[in-house]
Amino acid sequence: MELFRYMEQYDYEQLVFCQDKQSGLKAIIAIHDTTLGPALGGTRMWTYESEEAAIEDALRLARGMTYKNAAAGLNLGGGKTVIIGDPRKDKNEEMFRAFGRYIQGLNGRYITAEDVGTTVEDMDIIHDETDFVTGISPAFGSSGNPSPVTAYGVYKGMKAAAKAAFGTDSLEGKTVAVQGVGNVAYNLCRHLHEEGAKLIVTDINKEAVERAVAEFGARAVDPDDIYSQECDIYAPCALGATINDDTIPQLKAKVIAGAANNQLKETRHGDQIHDMGIVYAPDYVINAGGVINVADELYGYNSERALKKVEGIYGNIERVLEISKRDRIPTYLAADRLAEERIERMRQSRSQFLQNGHHILSRR
């Protein structure tokens, strides 16, 4: 892998390698773009096949956070960390303390958070060494469990997509097929049930399905049958890549709006559902409630302020749909364009984030 050529191609700013022999820390911090502000992105711990695979993952995820944060209207850039190791057996306090010192050494250019393979407890240890971390324990002033807030954002985004498809954002009487009934999807189902939507649910966790059936009057189906249900809205809220060659021919929904990440297996599947007239709410726009919520911690967490910002996901989806119509492009491309246009407007007046007295961190 020719690192500098790759970084130049996608306009990355910085790649930081962090090593601590005593604790076993091997971490890679990727900072993609800080035009809008310091880079925010979680720390992932994973057993990568090679160091090159870890680098590629860090770079890819950091770029994704640039787009997610920009589209969400946050004054934050995109970054990501990967720690090479098995989160089940390689963790220790010294590792996360050492990592916290490396973050502190970046002087605010990068702010971390929990991700796959890391926990709130890990973030608390990092917090012992630096303030540039979010998603810590509520005892330290954090926002707590982000799932209800993420679900609320998905609910608002779904209403915006429904308005485009059906002429009204009311979900009363609409049938929504929800794939996955985990923490986020359960809270989404609660909002939908309260508005009077009819629910079809599936999950590999039978207890979660039974709970949704009992509490929301949902109808349960087998996991493989969720795609072919007669419904108005398909809400993927579990694994990614569920919009693919096998599932698209089965879909009867007019809207796809859910909490899952990386819903399109390939970009061409976004083209395909666009050509079919399906209104697709791009994943990283509609599921941004979690990152909006933790970002509010940087101001000193205020739940009312955070929820008001999350409600803005409705308008963000509307803008994506407007760009899609304006430029005659699928919504997944329109989401990228929304983020890129915001970054470009800011780039006119600043080129990169450097610590100063007038930015988001000065409010902490």
From Swiss-Prot:
Functional pH dependence: Optimum pH is 10.3 for the oxidative deamination of L-leucine.
Does this entry carry the keyword Signal? no
Q: Which SUPFAM superfamilies match?
A: Aminoacid dehydrogenase-like, N-terminal domain (SSF53223), NAD(P)-binding Rossmann-fold domains (SSF51735)
Q: What's the top EC group for this one?
A: oxidoreductase
* GO molecular function annotations of the record: L-leucine dehydrogenase activity
Please tell me where NAD(+) binds in this chain.
G180, V181, G182, N183, V184, A185, Y186
What is the reaction catalyzed?
L-leucine + NAD(+) + H2O = 4-methyl-2-oxopentanoate + NH4(+) + NADH + H(+)
Q: Which InterPro entries does the entry mention?
A: Aminoacid_DH-like_N_sf, Glu/Leu/Phe/Val/Trp_DH, Glu/Leu/Phe/Val/Trp_DH_C, Glu/Leu/Phe/Val/Trp_DH_dimer, Glu/Leu/Phe/Val_DH_AS, Glu/Phe/Leu/Val/Trp_DH_bac/arc, NAD(P)-bd_dom_sf
Role according to the record: Catalyzes the reversible deamination of L-leucine to 4-methyl-2-oxopentanoate. Can also use other substrates such as L-isoleucine, L-valine and L-2-aminobutyrate. The 2-oxo analogs of branched-chain and straight-chain amino acids serve as good substrates for the reverse reaction.
The protein here is known as Leucine dehydrogenase
Q: What is the lineage of its organism?
A: Bacteria, Bacillati, Bacillota, Bacilli, Bacillales
Per the record, the gene is ldh
